């Protein structure tokens, strides 16, 4: 989670303290190499353990989850929202099946048909270690939908985080394919539960995201007190490729909640 280092340049000057942590099995945390431990309820309880250890509560605790962390943040809020002051769901949809449909119906057709066919063949054979797989995905998918900065300019903290990724954990939860979810989260969907979330909530989407920005806008209308932030130049890593919209919108949300303002727009 070292890619969150970029938040330091924006939140700290606004006197907003933030804490990011590596979950069990990734980054600098222990890796027990026991895939049976990789399930959503255990990760939710891990967030609660971290909250308790840091002494955070509904007076000061904003939970921001990005990508997979957005899934975790939604699940945490549905169980422990009495501990939250605010919720930020960054670049994540509330339904993995709908994410898969968006990947198939919207993202895949943007590929050159020949390149997509080669990727499909590799996936059909489950030959994910084939170097050709990443050679094709990096310029044709990652550079367009993960981070739109030129590949040679990808920020060092982001590259460092990607290099430390626990692929066993990733495949167990997400599945090996980049086109939708195929792991433990394949049927995850809390769309109908969003109205239960009563804490002020910000959903963030990027125009070029791997996730459907219209769905993330819709999510903000389903929670009781929601606001949507669109990063028009952003992709999945909007905190890097559209900082001009991401951070002012995030900071404004936090300050509005702190001031007791209604977040709906």
Give the label of every model feature segment.
Residues 42-60:
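Conserved acidic catalytic loop of the alpha/beta-hydrolase fold
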Residues 59-102:
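Conserved hydrolase catalytic core segment
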Residues 86-128:
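A catalytic-pocket lid/entrance helix-loop region that shapes and gates access to the active site
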Residues 110, 114-199:
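Alpha/beta-hydrolase
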Residues 191-234:
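Conserved loop-alpha-helix segment in the C-terminal half of the alpha/beta-hydrolase fold
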Residues 1, 23-27, 69, 94, ...:
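Alpha/beta-hydrolase active-site loop signature
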Residues 1-32, 36:
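Conserved HGGG/HGGXW glycine-rich cap/lid loop of the alpha/beta-hydrolase fold
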Residues 225-265:
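Catalytic active-site module of serine/aspartate enzymes centered on a nucleophile-bearing elbow/loop
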């Amino acid at each position: 989670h070292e890619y969150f280092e970029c938040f330091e340049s924006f939140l700290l000057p606004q006197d907003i303290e933030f804490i990011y942590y590596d979950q069990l099995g990734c980054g600098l945390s222990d890796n027990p190499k026991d895939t049976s431990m990789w399930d959503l309820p255990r990760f939710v309880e891990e967030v609660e353990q971290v909250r308790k250890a840091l002494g955070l509560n509904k007076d000061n605790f904003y939970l921001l989850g990005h990508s997979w962390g957005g899934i975790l943040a939604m699940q945490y809020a549905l169980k422990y929202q009495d501990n939250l002051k605010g919720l930020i769901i960054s670049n994540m949809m509330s339904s993995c099946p709908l994410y898969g449909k968006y990947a198939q119906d919207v993202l895949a057709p943007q590929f050159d048909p020949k390149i997509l066919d080669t990727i499909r063949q590799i996936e059909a054979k489950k030959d994910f270690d084939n170097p050709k797989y990443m050679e094709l995905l990096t310029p044709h998918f990652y550079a367009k939908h993960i981070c739109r900065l030129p590949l040679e300019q990808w920020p060092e903290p982001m590259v460092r985080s990607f290099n430390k990724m626990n692929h066993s954990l990733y495949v167990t939860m997400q599945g090996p394919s980049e086109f939708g979810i195929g792991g433990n989260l394949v049927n995850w969907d809390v769309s109908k539960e969003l109205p239960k979330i009563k804490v002020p909530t910000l959903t963030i989407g990027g125009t070029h995201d791997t996730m459907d920005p219209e769905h993330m806008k819709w999510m903000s209308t389903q929670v009781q007190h929601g606001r949507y932030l669109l990063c028009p130049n952003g992709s999945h890593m909007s905190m890097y490729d559209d900082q001009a919209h991401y951070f002012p919108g995030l900071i404004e949300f936090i300050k509005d909640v702190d001031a007791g303002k209604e977040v709906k727009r």
